[in-house]
């Protein structure tokens, strides 16, 4: 936690003088734009990548569906070194992964040579408050998935779609820790959330395309 130390302010009070405000700032030292730039993680394209949050960074989002897409995920790399995920709606064997990846080389699992790295995942469309748009959040981090599941089982949060969530990251590598916290819906945001979600669905959004390597936001 940052230790905020106050410093004395030597001021002269002038009556009836309006205080200028930063056009992008409601409160705080930094403008909204600067604060978002410093604190936000990667939200390029239509995906919210929580793993790319920097140490101390956070992101605020709202879930748009009551149930996520669930499955298993394996990553592979081709001869050019380009990597991409392959997803399954069942728990695949090593042979299943090798067959599905084709020319892509699967990542080695924790068991060493001869094993493949397969992880359980959930994915859901969310409204990212930083980008002001609908994005896909795909999670394999067990700690985040467990926290989300625990929150969903609390009586106070029986309707997860009525809440915002603040996800923060601390540390890096094997020492990474994530904290997920439900917070009240941001004032005045529901209209923007609804409009963005309606627009995404009208454009053909279908998250199940992740299972076939497609684009959830539009058909091929």
What is the role of each PLM region?
Residues 2, 7-156, 203-219:
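OB-fold ssDNA-binding interfaces and closely related basic DNA-contact patches used
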Residues 123, 164, 177:
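Beta-strand-rich binding-surface signature
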Residues 160-173:
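Flexible glycine-rich surface loops and low-complexity tracts that mediate binding to linear polymers
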Residues 161-163, 192, 205-206:
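Glycine-rich loops and low-complexity Gly/Arg-rich segments
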């Amino acid at each position: 936690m940052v230790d905020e130390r106050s410093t004395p302010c030597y001021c002269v009070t002038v009556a009836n003088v309006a205080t200028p405000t930063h056009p992008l700032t409601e409160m705080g030292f930094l403008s909204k734009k600067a604060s978002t730039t410093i604190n936000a993680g990667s939200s390029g394209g239509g995906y919210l990548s929580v793993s790319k949050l920097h140490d101390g960074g956070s992101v605020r989002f709202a879930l748009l569906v009551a149930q996520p897409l669930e499955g298993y995920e394996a990553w592979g790399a081709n001869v050019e070194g380009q990597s991409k995920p392959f997803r399954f709606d069942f728990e695949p064997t090593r042979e299943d992964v090798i067959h599905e990846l084709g020319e892509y080389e699967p990542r080695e699992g924790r068991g060493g040579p001869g094993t493949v790295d397969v992880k359980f995942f959930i994915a859901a469309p969310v409204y990212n408050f930083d980008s002001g748009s609908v994005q896909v959040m795909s999670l394999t981090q067990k700690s985040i998935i467990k926290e989300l599941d625990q929150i969903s089982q609390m009586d106070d949060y029986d309707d997860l779609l009525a809440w915002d969530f603040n996800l923060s990251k601390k540390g890096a590598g094997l020492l990474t820790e994530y904290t997920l916290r439900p917070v009240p819906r941001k004032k005045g945001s529901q209209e923007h959330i609804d409009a963005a979600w309606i627009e995404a669905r009208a454009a053909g959004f279908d998250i199940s395309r992740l299972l076939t390597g497609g684009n959830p936001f539009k058909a091929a």
